[in-house]
Design a protein with these regions (language model features):
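Interdomain motor-coupling "hinge/lid" segment immediately C-terminal to the ATP-binding subdomain
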Residues: 2-14, 127, 133-239
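Hydrophobic anchor at the beta1->P-loop junction of P-loop NTPases
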Residues: 41
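Conserved lysine of the Walker
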Residues: 49-50
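Short glycine-rich substrate-engagement loop in P-loop NTPases that contacts/grips substrate
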Residues: 63-93
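Accessory nucleic acid-recognition modules appended to NTPase machines
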Residues: 195-353
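Domain-level recognition of nuclease-like catalytic cores that cleave nucleotide substrates
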Residues: 393-414
Length: 414
């Protein structure tokens, strides 16, 4: 065990010596580390959770355990591990537990460490870490930081352009970068080297399905699981139901389909957006729209005869809203009016609708503008909301219709 931990210390030190892409933090690192609560960094694989945790602790004395290591898991002995940590990391202040969800009964062990006064930073690639798995023993004991692939603004930072303060001579470059991001996404490895995009994301997608879904849940029918994942990534931004998917893909039961859908959400690969309705029963019955965590997966995996820029932009807007803290269980929905007009995103704050967001890549056609504006104003009337936005690729203006003022903004100003 000591050899494993010593090897992991070498791994930690090597990781700390590397240069890293800069991320924008929505939190105060010093305040976070000063808290006695568990610091939990969650998000998809390979978005930089481990890097962020290492950078947070770079100038601190901290111990490190990487649970993506099979030798560590195979020889696991909690008491022995703690003795070896004291030996390898004398006088450590923090313990970094990387991808701790791979350890069986991890929550019980973490709870015990917390009870003993250990200051913990944890990373994990499973959305359910904050629900069923942590609901009992760790409730009220943690602070969460959720990480996603690079935002558009962070992508511009990497390319040394301030998205919020563009100079006239940067407009052409900015348009190229915005289009690049929409098509290829923001995974850190891909941002650093665009030549890697398709091969890297193809492998990553398959790895998530195998490590975080099939292996974790002991899925026997890998073919059906893969077929569902391919169907979802190819039909992103479209409404789906478990019943329809079961029939379309020839699965054995609706329960199996729903179970697989839930499994594919857990590692942050897919999100399912409910249709807004005041009646919870009707909302649960309605189709949900499926979104993928990064547009690059669409380029790498989707079956498509031609790219759909409108759907790519819509997916990008959705992920940006998730990044800002909107929750598909509580605060973000789509909506269909009584006349079947659709709004892409309904944003709720408590009991009130705070904003309606429509996405339209190109509004240069009068027919397209009329369709989008009519949908927005009709739904605004039904939902009693006056804060109306249409997000476009590069259009910016104000439209007034039926007493409503609609802000048309480019994605760069969302």
């Amino acid at each position: 065990m000591k050899t494993i931990i010593l090897n992991q210390r070498k791994e930690r030190d090597e990781l700390l010596s590397r240069p890293y892409l800069t991320r924008r933090n929505s939190y105060d690192v010093d305040m976070l580390l000063s808290s006695h609560l568990i610091k939990l960094i969650t998000g998809p694989r390979r978005v930089g959770k481990s890097t962020q945790a290492l950078l947070m602790l770079r100038n601190k004395n901290f111990a490190y355990l990487n649970f993506d290591s099979q030798p560590l898991l195979d020889s696991w002995d909690a008491n022995l591990v703690m003795r070896m940590l004291d030996d390898v990391y004398p006088d450590y202040e923090y313990i970094l537990l990387d991808e701790v969800q791979n350890l069986d009964a991890w929550d019980m062990w973490v709870s015990e460490l917390y009870r003993l006064g250990k200051n913990l930073v944890i990373t994990g690639s499973n959305a359910k870490m904050l629900s069923s798995e942590m609901a009992t023993v760790l409730t009220g004991k943690y602070l969460q930081v959720e990480m996603l692939p690079f935002s558009l603004e962070e992508f511009f930072d990497w390319n040394k352009i301030d998205l919020k303060a563009l100079k006239p001579e940067q407009q052409t470059d900015a348009s190229v970068l915005t289009d690049d991001y929409m098509r290829n996404g923001g995974y850190p490895e891909v941002v650093a080297s665009r030549q890697l995009t398709r091969s890297y994301l193809d492998t990553l997608f398959d790895s998530i399905i195998w490590k975080d879904v099939a292996k974790r849940h002991h899925v026997r029918n890998i073919t059906d699981l893969n077929n569902l994942a391919m169907y979802l990534v190819s039909n992103f931004c479209n409404p789906i139901t478990a019943n329809d998917l079961t029939e379309e893909l020839g699965f054995s039961s609706v329960n199996t389909t729903q179970k697989f859908m839930d499994y594919l959400h857990e590692p942050y690969l897919f999100y399912y957006l409910p249709r807004y309705n005041n009646k919870l029963k009707l909302m649960k019955k309605a189709p949900r729209k499926v979104y993928v965590v990064d547009n690059g997966f669409v380029a790498a995996k989707a079956f498509a005869l031609s790219e759909n820029l409108g759907r790519l932009l819509e997916n990008q807007v959705f992920i940006e809203l998730i990044r800002r803290g909107y929750d598909t269980d509580k605060t973000i929905f789509y909506y269909r009016s009584r006349n079947d007009k659709e709004i892409d995103f309904v944003l709720r704050n408590g009991p009130h609708i705070e904003r309606l967001v429509q996405v339209c890549y190109d509004m240069s056609s009068p027919k397209t503008e009329k369709r989008e504006v009519n949908s927005l104003t009709e739904c605004a009337g039904e939902l009693n909301c006056n804060n109306l936005v249409i997000v476009t690729n590069n259009d910016e203006r104000t439209i007034e219709k039926d007493g409503y003022k609609i802000d048309v903004i480019p994605i760069s100003k969302l």
